[in-house]
Regions:
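Short hydrophobic beta-strand element within catalytic cores of glycosyltransferases
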Residues: 313-316, 323-327
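A short, well-ordered alpha-helix in the C-terminal region of glycosyltransferases
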Residues: 364-379, 385-391
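Conserved acidic donor-binding segment of nucleotide-sugar-dependent glycosyltransferases
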Residues: 342-349, 357-363
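Acidic donor-binding loop of glycosyltransferase active sites
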Residues: 182, 295-309, 320-323
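Conserved catalytic-core segment of nucleotide-activated headgroup transferases in glycan assembly
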Residues: 206-296
Length: 399
């Protein structure tokens, strides 16, 4: 098959969860012998320098990128607010991207055009006018669910009202446009059920994100009595979750396990976190090698209060045998068993109890990690995921 993959941000280098999810599918489809061309947006938030990318990747994917200014602008935001339109979607409308898509589709024919976000839907009419390919939405999450959970956790009444507006306009947009695609492939069963319950009449199947276990782990000692979090801090649910953890959970965790130290890694750390000053809390910032960082620490904590889709950093940590303590929302979409391959904690006391149990009983924690690694190896193998979605693509083309 010949596939055009259109991405809302650069899938390579795969340094954050979203990029890892897109890139793993690219690699899996290429491994199967399919032809995959990658076209991606890049922005100030998600920059891309082709000159620094591996030549092999560029050649295999015929990689191209288009800049889009995603900075929030007051007047367009107010216009969208007054017109009841989704400002999230409007920010991704780009004349340069329209020109690039038209150029590609006039030059090449594709069997499948894979859109990596609902935010790319404004380009669907153009794609339909220039291509006979089946057009599918690979949905990493249900965007409006993220904002719904976010506004419900927001105390400022004005901010809460505006975030609610963003959530509702995005929900309406998703419901209106989802049937314009030939098929929808969310990454979780939860999201697939949401689309069907909200009117999706197209083929809608959950296809997980692939993650291969590294053959060789970094030669680094695991620091005892440590917990860690790693994630992009330009994603609001991560910021919200870490603030809640430090404000509401850390004292309970520290009281239960006085010896524990916490490490927080990720790009674009906000100023308040960089200036956070408390004993045994270490703000690491961006790391060059996420696997090396995770290998050097003991237990991952993922205290998300909002979000949708699947947390790829959890899958990455599980793949190397790390014990993960996460909220129910953070673990949403994973095929987990609480107490077997992950530990679920939704309150400060539950986090404190789980951390204490793992630190006091390392063998227990190690067993959780081993079971987690087995889960990822069997259920989230990159090539198996690519085979699954390829089977659905074949069905679409033969229908």
């Amino acid at each position: 098959m010949k596939i055009l993959q259109i991405c809302y941000k650069p899938p390579f280098p795969a340094t954050d969860g979203g990029a890892m999810g897109m890139n793993s599918l690219t690699e899996g489809l290429l491994n199967m012998g399919h032809s995959v061309k990658v076209l991606a947006f890049h922005s100030k938030k998600h920059p891309c320098n082709i000159a620094t990318m591996p030549k092999d990747y560029i050649e295999r994917t015929s990689f191209e990128t288009v800049f889009v200014d995603l900075d929030i602008k007051l007047i367009p935001a107010m216009e969208a607010f007054l017109l009841g339109e989704s400002y999230h979607v409007k920010r991704f409308i780009s004349t340069a991207m329209k020109t690039k898509i038209a150029e590609i589709l006039k030059r090449e024919e594709f069997d499948i055009i894979q859109m990596e976000s609902i935010f790319l839907t404004p380009y669907l009419p153009l794609v339909r006018s220039l291509s006979k390919a089946k057009v599918v939405l690979r949905s990493p999450n249900v965007e409006n669910k993220i904002w719904k959970r976010t506004y419900k956790a927001t105390k400022n009444p004005f901010k809460r009202y505006y975030l609610k507006h963003l959530s509702l306009t995005l929900a309406n947009y998703e419901k209106q446009k989802v049937n314009d695609y030939d098929a929808i492939f969310p990454v979780t069963e939860t999201d697939a059920e949401y689309f069907v319950e909200n009117g999706c009449r197209r083929l809608c199947k959950a296809v997980a994100v692939g993650m291969d276990t590294p053959e060789i782990l970094p030669d680094v000692l695991e620091e005892e009595n440590t917990i860690f979090h790693i994630g992009s801090m330009n994603w609001f649910p991560n910021v919200q979750g870490i603030k809640w953890f430090l404000d509401e959970c850390w004292r309970s965790v520290k009281a239960a396990s006085p010896q524990v130290k916490a490490y927080f890694a990720g790009r674009n750390m906000p100023g308040w976190l960089l200036n956070y000053d408390e004993k045994d809390v270490h703000i690491v910032g961006e790391v060059d090698d996420s696997i090396r960082f995770m290998t050097s620490k003991q237990i991952m904590v993922v205290p998300l209060l909002s979000g949708s889709g699947i947390r790829i950093k959890i899958i990455e940590a599980m793949s190397i045998g790390k014990t993960v303590i996460a909220t129910t929302i953070a673990a949403e979409g994973l095929m987990y068993e609480d107490g077997k391959n992950i530990l679920i904690a939704d309150t400060p006391k539950e986090f404190a109890d789980a951390v204490k149990k793992c630190l006091e009983d390392p063998a227990y924690a190690k067993e959780i990690g081993k079971c987690a690694a087995r889960l990822i190896a069997t259920k989230y193998n990159t090539d198996n995921i690519a085979k699954e979605i390829s089977r659905y693509y074949k069905e679409l083309l033969e229908a």
